[in-house]
Design a protein with these regions (language model features):
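Transmembrane-helix signature of polytopic, membrane-embedded enzymes
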Residues: 20-22, 81, 230-233, 252-272
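Membrane-interface alpha helices of multi-pass inner-membrane proteins
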Residues: 276, 307-323, 327-334
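Transmembrane helical bundles and short interhelical boundary loops of multi-pass, membrane-embedded
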Residues: 34-57, 357-363, 368-379, 524-560
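Short acidic/glycine- and proline-prone juxtamembrane loop motifs at membrane-interface regions
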Residues: 280-287
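Transmembrane-helix motifs of polytopic, lipid-linked glycan transferases
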Residues: 67, 237-261
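Perimembrane helix-loop-helix junctions
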Residues: 297-303, 326-357
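Interfacial juxtamembrane loops and adjacent helix segments
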Residues: 120-236
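Membrane-lumen/periplasm interface segments of multi-pass, membrane-embedded glycan/lipid transferases
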Residues: 363-451
């Protein structure tokens, strides 16, 4: 064969990747234009004075970057690396789509993390922060949507009829038919212009938060941000990004450690709620990562010393971050058969030592917080004087049937918490699309785990199911005892993020059932490939929707 003919045969292999990139990026750019036009028309951005070129540029740029990332990840063959890349990239979008202080308790977490980044490893209620921190906290109250919600009676300008209004759940409010739109952008303007105003913000001091260890990643990010000359807002995003790196690293370790049902793990890690917490200043970022890592280790056929060590470290850390309820994780390695246990220590001794380490860290953290605490005085119980843990526990023990009714009623009122996977903010920012689609996406992930090689066995799956039920009831009971007024008929303070490891176990259980019912022919490798595509794009859509609901629309019109 001549050299000319060889060159002709090789041309398609050179041109095909370039053509694929050009086609995909063109489609993505077109979709970006469509989304920007939809935002401009449906949410009236032009009438609100928002630059059309800016909106179009943002949408097109983001869509093109997403397409480029998807094409680049096609070259990555390792599932764990590909999954970690999706978690990191989508997590960055969540870090910036989520306005400051809007993750539950993020104000306290921000203040504690900022203090640690300044080298403060003790706790002083009278110690303040730089003035720009005061301004940031004043500009962005926690539960921003609830703080800017109003209800009452107004007059419709078209029909002149009185009608009630309630702007709960809407981050953007328009006062009058053609009036000004109030949004969280006003808070950014308030913070960014604080140097030019005469008013002095209320001074903030260190919060009632006495943890150090889980806030170290965020503190490192804040220290780096200050090193580059960034202010309070830059420190917030710097802390979020390094916290996201910690979450990504733990998820990567979990994906590498999981020997079965890896699509289920990737799906729960890329759930918008998981990324929302992982890309915040909350200690849930590392806590969720530890949960996923421990469950991933339990998919291994055999345990050696290294596996046992990683599980013990994750379990001890989880207990140091959220004590007592996480002691339940100590018993999970006992579900392994004796033939599967290749660790030098016996299972019973290992469980006792892990429990001892968890309790030691828990008590050490409590003593550290007590001894290095200054000027706090008597700390009031959360929930007020009507909350009494001992009395509530006694009430539960005396009225077990009534408490079962309380559990069931709370689950019913909150859509089983599975239907609240799209409830963001301080439970004040509902995104209906995510709440509706998250359960089907989890079911799809279960279907991708139906390969025969992904089976965990009846014994292990059965005990994991029991653990999931006990953990869910335990989490609800803990909130009933510590946060809920004595005898109340519903449980106060529960959020769907507490149940994310339970939803992972539910997906594993659904996969076991579907494997028997459907007799699928899907291979594990094909399931993993489909999982990256499905869950990656779903996470991307979740970040875009979170940004849309906080900054673009829908807009609630209030008629006075």
């Amino acid at each position: 064969m001549s050299n000319v003919s060889k060159k002709k045969l090789s041309l398609p292999t050179v041109q095909q990747p370039a053509a694929r990139w050009a086609f995909v990026l063109t489609v993505c750019a077109s979709l970006g234009v469509v989304v920007s036009y939809y935002w401009r028309v449906f949410y009236g951005l032009d009438a609100r004075g928002v630059s059309a070129a800016g909106v179009t540029g943002l949408c097109v740029g983001l869509a093109v970057l997403a397409g480029a990332a998807a094409l680049a990840l096609r070259r990555v063959r390792d599932f764990a690396k590909k999954g970690a890349a999706c978690i990191l990239l989508c997590g960055v979008l969540f870090a910036f789509a989520n306005p400051p202080m809007q993750t539950p308790d993020e104000t306290d977490h921000y203040l504690r993390t900022y203090a640690i980044s300044m080298g403060r490893f003790d706790f002083d209620a009278q110690r303040g922060y730089p003035e720009d921190v005061d301004e940031l906290v004043a500009a962005f109250p926690g539960a921003w949507v609830n703080a800017h919600t109003s209800a009452g009676l107004g007059t419709d300008p078209d029909t002149h009829a009185e009608q009630p209004f309630n702007s709960a759940g809407y981050a953007l409010k328009q006062y009058g038919k053609d009036g000004r739109v109030e949004s969280i952008r006003d808070s950014f303007e308030q913070y960014l212009t604080w140097l030019y105003r005469d008013s002095v913000p209320q001074r903030v001091t260190e919060p009632v938060s006495f943890l150090i260890l889980p806030f170290l990643p965020g503190a490192l990010g804040m220290a780096l941000a200050r090193l580059f000359g960034l202010g309070a807002l830059g420190c917030l995003y710097g802390g979020r990004l390094v916290n996201l790196l910690a979450y990504t690293a733990l998820c990567y370790a979990a994906l590498r450690s999981a020997h079965k049902c890896r699509p289920a793990f990737l799906c729960i890690m890329l759930m918008p709620m998981s990324l929302y917490m992982g890309a915040s200043l909350s200690y849930d970022a590392t806590l969720l990562g530890c949960y996923y890592l421990m469950l991933a280790l339990l998919t291994r056929d055999e345990w050696d010393d290294k596996t046992a060590l990683f599980y013990a470290l994750a379990c001890v850390f989880a207990n140091g971050t959220k004590p007592y309820i996480n002691l339940l994780w100590v018993v999970l390695p006992l579900i392994l058969r004796k033939s599967e246990w290749k660790v030098r220590l016996s299972r019973a001794v290992y469980a006792v030592l892990t429990a001892a380490g968890a309790l030691a860290l828990t008590l050490g953290v409590e003593q550290y917080g007590t001894l290095l605490r200054h000027n706090y005085g008597a700390i009031a119980r959360q929930g007020g004087t009507t909350v009494n843990g001992g009395a509530q526990l006694l009430f539960v023990l005396k009225n077990p049937l009534r408490y079962i009714a309380v559990l069931l009623g709370t689950l019913y009122e909150n859509d089983g918490f599975l239907g609240q996977l799209g409830l963001f903010g301080w439970k004040d920012m509902p995104i209906a699309f995510i709440s509706i689609t998250a359960p089907p996406v989890l079911l799809a992930a279960a279907m991708l785990c139906t390969a025969q090689t992904d089976t965990l066995g009846r014994r292990r799956m059965g005990w994991l199911g029991v653990f999931g039920l006990v953990y869910a009831v335990g989490a609800m009971t803990a909130m009933y005892i510590t946060y809920t007024p004595v005898g109340m008929v519903r449980i106060v303070g529960l959020q769907t993020r507490y149940f994310l490891p339970v939803w992972l176990l539910l997906v594993l259980a659904a996969a076991a059932v579907l494997r028997r019912v459907l007799a699928p022919r899907l291979t594990a490798a094909k399931g993993e490939t489909l999982a990256v595509t499905l869950c990656g794009w779903y996470a991307f859509a979740g970040a875009v929707l979170l940004f849309q609901h906080y900054f673009v629309g829908p807009v609630y019109t209030i008629y006075k």
